[in-house]
């Protein structure tokens, strides 16, 4: 299958904002895809190369990409860089360079999708001494044979800046439409495996029956079950039917642990493989988890010198560290508090009631200094739960989780079977979708940022406000450096940014607002932290903001 067919799909997707049209375009394309291509083409359609849990990264920045294009076209790198000032898009500038190509091989052959994919895999797997030169040559070989439209989208794939508006929800619907299978079965299979390539292939070859049989696989992380927030203990107990399991809510990073014999793999909440960054936890898991094969979930917490928990950002620092890991182990010791088990020795437990899963967890875990089971309390008594809540806060934790005793595990769902109880309104994780340049001495820096909440139905990010407070000068330097390559267009001081970066913000309150399409606006938002553990589709949704608005009004006594 030729790559130009995929490039033309990208172009059509870019030209329409209508979700139904996009879905039909992707579905019609998937129908034509050979079976052996289905394992990777869904990721290319999303603008990726690998699933989010795959450790491999392309490791190619703008400069290396431009050098590869220069090598392929004979056009000076500086000329390509300068062209971006006119086009506003490196992909467009690369397409123009390829159009003006000064040299083309006599042996040039049309690009196939498989060749492009295999080359990108080779780029990702090339490491060590001289790897940058090798990566450049691999990419240059693609650009030598590429048509301008192909070059544009190869470049965008490499940089992760596709801009076609295809998100997980749209791809799910397109798979359902293409292969005439139930959308809820596609959703379920994806939530259990986090692998659209696998799901698309099953949908085509085995249909609804095959999708219904999909189950958990060690090595493919499950989309985590999520919680809503309750106003207080009393409301949580009422929602749970009068009795609940209360657990300490740790201020850490949620992880999913897959054990397969002596092999342990640990995934972040965003399903990224963080195993190499936390070797001491890997060893502790081998000792603590008795079964040969298991999948468990827990909260990874950084511990201070006083034995109290440190803010979750310290755990993220551990995740980011690729070198001098032993030094970081000393500086930021970690502790894993397990709270659920999803799979043991070939048996999926997600359809098992929560209390049975909790008992199973206690049976299979032998706690040690690094791995523990989350402290809990089962009660019908409000006062007893209040005392437990108070103690959790005094110990430096965030609050409590309340869990329905008979709840099954629902991957990817944010329902009311799990509830958070915290002393303040929940902070929001939102995507930066635009920004404004600063003034005076900060004129060269982005100074305030437009915040977007995710709409899973359309794949859009709808504006809910602008944040400019809470940032240090160093923060603004870092954000400007991070966001500059993601700028889509500029108009005066305002820039539009590709939705990639998630930040956590606090705010005074949520207001209803006709000013924004979202219907909501944040009053006095303030920057708290960069959420590197979350991708744009993990950001808070419009529905979530509506729920928090209702909760806020209940806490005020207005509802």
Swiss-Prot record:
Domain of life from the UniProt record: Archaea
Obligatory cofactor(s): Mg(2+)
GO molecular function, one term: DNA ligase (ATP) activity
Matches recorded under Gene3D superfamilies: DNA ligase, ATP-dependent, N-terminal domain (1.10.3260.10), DNA ligase/mRNA capping enzyme (3.30.470.30), Nucleic acid-binding proteins (2.40.50.140)
Active site residues according to the UniProt entry: 249 (n6-amp-lysine intermediate)
Pfam families linked: DNA_ligase_A_C, DNA_ligase_A_M, DNA_ligase_A_N
Catalytic activity from the UniProt record: ATP + (deoxyribonucleotide)n-3'-hydroxyl + 5'-phospho-(deoxyribonucleotide)m = (deoxyribonucleotide)n+m + AMP + diphosphate
Family: Belongs to the ATP-dependent DNA ligase family.
The protein, known as: DNA ligase
Source organism of this protein record: Pyrococcus abyssi
Gene: lig
């Amino acid at each position: 299958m030729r790559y130009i067919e995929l490039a033309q799909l990208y172009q059509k997707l870019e030209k329409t904002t209508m979700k139904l049209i996009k879905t039909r375009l992707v579905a019609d394309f998937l129908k034509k895809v050979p079976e052996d291509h289905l394992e990777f083409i869904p990721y290319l359609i999303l603008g990726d190369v690998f699933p989010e849990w795959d450790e491999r990264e392309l490791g190619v920045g703008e400069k290396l990409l431009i050098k590869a294009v220069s090598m392929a076209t004979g056009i000076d790198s500086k000329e390509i860089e300068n062209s971006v000032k006119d086009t506003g898009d490196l992909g467009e500038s690369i397409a123009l360079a390829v159009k003006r190509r000064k040299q083309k091989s006599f042996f040039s052959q049309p690009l196939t999708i498989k060749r492009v994919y295999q080359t990108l895999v080779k780029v990702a797997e090339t490491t060590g001494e001289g790897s940058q030169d090798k990566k450049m040559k691999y990419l240059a070989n693609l650009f030598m044979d590429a048509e301008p439209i192909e070059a544009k989208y190869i470049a965008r794939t490499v940089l992760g800046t596709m801009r076609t508006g295809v998100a997980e929800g749209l791809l799910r619907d397109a798979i359902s439409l293409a292969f005439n299978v139930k959308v809820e079965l596609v959703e379920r299979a994806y939530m259990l495996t986090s692998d659209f390539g696998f799901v698309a292939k099953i949908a085509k070859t085995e249909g609804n029956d095959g999708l219904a049989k999909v189950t958990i696989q060690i090595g493919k992380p499950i989309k985590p079950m999520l919680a809503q927030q309750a106003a207080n203990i009393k409301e949580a107990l009422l929602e749970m039917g009068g009795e609940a399991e209360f657990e300490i809510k740790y201020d850490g990073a949620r992880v999913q642990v897959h054990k397969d014999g002596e092999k342990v793999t640990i995934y972040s909440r965003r399903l990224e493989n963080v195993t190499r960054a936390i070797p001491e936890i890997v060893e502790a898991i081998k000792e603590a988890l008795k079964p040969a094969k298991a999948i468990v979930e827990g909260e990874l917490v950084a511990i201070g010198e006083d034995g109290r928990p440190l803010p979750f950002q310290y755990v993220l620092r551990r995740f980011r560290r690729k070198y001098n890991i032993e030094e970081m182990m000393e500086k930021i010791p970690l502790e894993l508090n397990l709270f659920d088990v999803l799979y043991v020795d070939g048996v999926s437990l997600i359809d098992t009631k929560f209390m049975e899963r909790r008992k199973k967890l206690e049976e299979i875990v032998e706690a040690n200094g690094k791995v523990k089971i989350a402290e809990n309390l089962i009660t019908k008594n409000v006062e007893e739960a209040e005392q437990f809540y108070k103690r959790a806060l005094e110990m430096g934790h965030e609050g409590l989780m309340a869990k329905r005793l008979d709840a099954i595990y629902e991957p990817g769902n944010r329902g009311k079977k799990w509830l958070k109880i915290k002393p303040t309104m929940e902070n929001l994780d939102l995507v930066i979708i635009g920004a404004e340049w600063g003034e005076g001495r900060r004129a060269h820096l982005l100074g305030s940022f437009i915040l977007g909440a995710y709409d899973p139905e359309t794949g859009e990010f709808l504006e809910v406000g602008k944040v400019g407070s809470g940032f240090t000068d160093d923060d603004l330097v870092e954000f400007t450096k991070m966001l500059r390559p993601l700028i889509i267009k500029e108009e005066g001081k305002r820039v539009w940014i590709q939705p990639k970066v998630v930040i956590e913000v606090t705010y005074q309150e949520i207001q209803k607002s006709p000013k924004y399409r979202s219907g909501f606006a944040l009053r006095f938002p303030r920057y708290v932290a960069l959420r590197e553990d979350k991708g744009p589709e993990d950001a808070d949704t419009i529905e979530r903001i509506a729920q928090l608005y209702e909760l806020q009004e209940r806490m005020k006594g207005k509802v």
